[in-house]
A protein has these predicted regions:
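Conserved N-terminal beta1-alpha1 strand-loop-helix module at the mouth
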Residues: 1-106, 111-139, 154-160, 164-174, ...
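A short, flexible beta-alpha/helix-coil linker loop
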Residues: 146-148
Length: 190
């Protein structure tokens, strides 16, 4: 059964329009000062979308790091997206999250985050998952496009998945993740 479509709100449409260009994902960094320095450098270099992802941190460290990142992202006018933990995002007033298949119900997350929230979903290499989630998601992510040191067991997704999904005219931004670097980014952007 397909999820019920959710209403579009101007704030949500504006956030969705931000999903383009290079999208940075933080490293699993335990040192908040080092994380902030790395993020500051990336944002000063032009990154306008940042996903906070720290699979090794406990909830206290995640909260501390997000509280520190939020004003940095606001100062740089960068969209801050929280990976996995929509409850923590809601607690901190962050309106954007990225959810994998085991991260909870999208509609429950949207209700907690508010109607203007932005929710991206991992589709891995599944065109069917993209089609099923497009009515309730704001962007669709595919990957790992390349081998990744941070997620060595990630499911591979061929670049051809983008053409397949674009042919469906789902009207959602598409995001490629996993192992993208200076050597292969050209093939992703093509």
């Amino acid at each position: 059964m397909l999820p019920a479509p959710s209403s579009d709100y101007p704030e949500r449409q504006a956030r969705r329009a931000l999903i383009h260009g290079v999208y940075a994902i933080t490293a699993d960094e335990g040192d908040t000062a080092r994380l902030l320095a790395d993020v500051e450098a990336a944002l000063s270099g032009g990154i306008r979308i940042l996903q906070y992802r720290n699979k090794h941190a406990d909830i206290a460290l995640k909260r501390q790091q997000l509280e520190a990142l939020k004003p940095v992202c606001e100062r740089h006018q960068t969209l801050l997206i929280v990976n996995d933990d929509w409850r923590l995002a809601a607690e901190l007033g962050i309106k954007a999250v990225h959810l994998g298949e085991d991260d909870g119900d999208i509609e429950e997350a949207r209700q907690a985050l508010g109607p203007g929230s932005l929710i991206g979903v991992s589709c891995y290499a599944s065109v069917e998952r993209a089609q099923a989630l497009a009515p309730v998601a704001d962007y669709l992510a595919f990957g790992a496009l390349f081998a990744s040191g941070t997620k060595p067991l990630a499911r591979p997704a061929p670049l051809s998945v983008f053409r397949e999904v674009q042919a469906l005219s789902l009207a959602r931004p598409l995001v490629g993740i996993g192992g993208i670097d200076a050597d292969n980014i050209g093939s992703v952007l093509d």
